[in-house]
């Protein structure tokens, strides 16, 4: 059974606290039509529409449905409360407009307050903490008050450098530089920024120059000076890989070095008689490198045929290759060549006294020279080297 709760009805005759309830306890669902049937239900549905009349049975009397009249006091209270709400809304609107106008005035004061960009930036940063209105002011101000970027041309930079050099790099300040330059388009902030970059770049260049100077000093310190603290020794130089050190040719008067039997150039040597006293003799030829060497010939094949740094005339073995008379314009130099007897005597001294150094100009024969000489003499059966 469906039960409908009583609904309160407000009656405004003499008091607003008087209520009347209508009792719907006698109403049941038995008189309602059945809407669940499927089929030809048009007649039943039209017949059942009249069930709404049953809801209002017994409500014809004046005591049940009296005239609804609203008290003037209640109506005044409702109308007064509505007017108050309208006034409150109007007040809020006016307050918001006043606040926006005040914010616009603050933005204008901040934008036109100081001529220096640094103070304006501080004001804007302080205003960021106040809320969204300061951000709007910042965006409007940046669009209106943003200054163009300064183009430091070579001429402008030259004036800046002259002003800095006049004041001193360490003592120069932006205000004094700006006064000396006397350029209307520049501000103190522009000059200060350019001065900081100039000092940083100059410091970097000085550091590089100092490093290069110290490196040169260290490099020259490793090179010893002959005769000063080094016992007259020559400084060591790194050799070129694969090439022997260059030795300047030495000319010892009009004498030739002593050639030893077995050297490849000895059989081909032919003495030359000088035509004058001032004639110079060419250096002995160096043995040609065999074709079997893949690259550069060995170092010992390119050595001169006589020791370097010593004269041919010496106290030891003075009878070998040393003239016994003075040279002059009337006595032209003679191509003195040692005889076979003197050569055999020198070789005999070397064999008998192996602990003594070889005489000047006497060198052991090379392997190639010995093999060439043996082949020239017809010796073909040569034992292998140990």
UniProtKB/Swiss-Prot annotation:
Subunit-level organization: Interacts with NAC92.
Keyword Transcription regulation: yes
Residue segments, region Disordered: 78-140
Organism encoding this protein: Arabidopsis thaliana
PROSITE patterns: HTH_MYB (PS51294)
Top-level taxon of the source organism: Eukaryota
Molecular-function annotations in GO: DNA binding; DNA-binding transcription factor activity
Compartments in which it is found: Nucleus
GO BP terms in the entry: chloroplast organization; negative regulation of flower development; negative regulation of leaf senescence; positive regulation of DNA-templated transcription; regulation of chlorophyll biosynthetic process
InterPro entries: GLK1/2-like (IPR044825), Homeodomain-like_sf (IPR009057), Myb_dom (IPR017930), Myb_dom_plants (IPR006447), SANT/Myb (IPR001005)
Keyword Transcription regulation: yes
Cellular component annotations (GO), alphabetically ordered: nucleus
Protein name listed in UniProt: Transcription activator GLK2
The protein's role, per its UniProt record: Transcriptional activator that functions with GLK1 to promote chloroplast development. Acts as an activator of nuclear photosynthetic genes involved in chlorophyll biosynthesis, light harvesting, and electron transport. Acts in a cell-autonomous manner to coordinate and maintain the photosynthetic apparatus within individual cells. May function in photosynthetic capacity optimization by integrating responses to variable environmental and endogenous cues. Prevents premature senescence.
Knockout or disruption consequences: Pale green siliques. Pale-green seedlings in double mutants glk1/glk2.
Tissue expr: Expressed in cotyledons and rosette and cauline leaves. Expressed at low levels in roots, shoots, flowers and siliques.
DNA-binding interval(s): 144-203
Keywords: DNA-binding, Nucleus, Transcription, Transcription regulation
Something else known: Plants overexpressing GLK2 have a delay in flowering under long days.
NCBIfam families, A to Z: myb_SHAQKYF (TIGR01557)
Cross-referenced Pfam families: Myb_DNA-binding
Induction remarks: By light. Repressed by BZR2.
């Amino acid at each position: 059974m469906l039960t409908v709760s009583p609904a309160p009805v407000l009656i405004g005759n003499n008091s607003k606290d008087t209520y009347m309830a209508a009792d719907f306890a006698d109403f049941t669902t038995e008189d309602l039509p059945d809407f669940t049937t499927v089929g030809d239900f048009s007649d039943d549905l039209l017949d059942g529409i009249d069930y709404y009349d049953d809801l209002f049975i017994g409500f014809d009397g004046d005591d049940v449905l009296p005239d609804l009249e609203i008290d003037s006091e209640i109506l005044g209270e409702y109308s007064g409360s509505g007017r108050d709400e309208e006034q409150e809304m109007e007040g809020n609107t006016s307050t918001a407009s006043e606040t926006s106008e005040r914010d616009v005035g603050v933005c204008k004061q901040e934008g036109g307050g100081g001529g220096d960009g640094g103070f304006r930036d501080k004001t804007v940063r302080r205003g960021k903490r106040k809320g969204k209105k300061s951000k709007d002011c910042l965006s409007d101000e940046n669009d209106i008050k943003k200054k163009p970027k300064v183009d430091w041309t070579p001429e402008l930079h030259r004036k800046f450098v002259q002003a800095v050099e006049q004041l001193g790099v360490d003592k120069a300040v932006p205000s004094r530089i700006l006064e000396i330059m006397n350029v209307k388009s520049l501000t103190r902030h522009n000059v200060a920024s350019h001065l900081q970059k100039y000092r940083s770049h100059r410091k970097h260049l000085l550091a590089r120059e100092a490093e290069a100077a110290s490196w040169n000093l260290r490099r020259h310190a490793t090179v010893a000076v002959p005769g000063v603290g080094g016992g007259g020794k020559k400084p060591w130089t790194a050799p070129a890989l694969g090439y022997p050190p260059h030795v300047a040719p030495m000319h010892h008067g009009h004498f030739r070095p002593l050639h030893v039997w077995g050297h490849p150039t000895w059989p081909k040597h032919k003495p030359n008689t000088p035509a004058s006293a001032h004639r110079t003799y060419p250096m002995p030829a160096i043995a040609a490198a065999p074709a079997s060497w893949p690259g550069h010939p060995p170092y010992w094949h390119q050595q001169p045929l006589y020791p370097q740094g010593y004269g041919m005339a010496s106290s030891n073995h003075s009878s070998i290759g040393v003239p016994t008379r003075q040279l002059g314009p009337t006595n032209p130099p003679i191509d003195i060549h040692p005889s076979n007897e003197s050569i055999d005597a020198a070789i005999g001294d070397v064999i008998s006294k192996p602990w003594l150094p070889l005489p000047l100009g006497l060198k052991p024969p090379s392997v190639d020279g010995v093999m060439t000489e043996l082949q020239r003499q017809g010796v073909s059966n040569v034992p292998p080297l140990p």
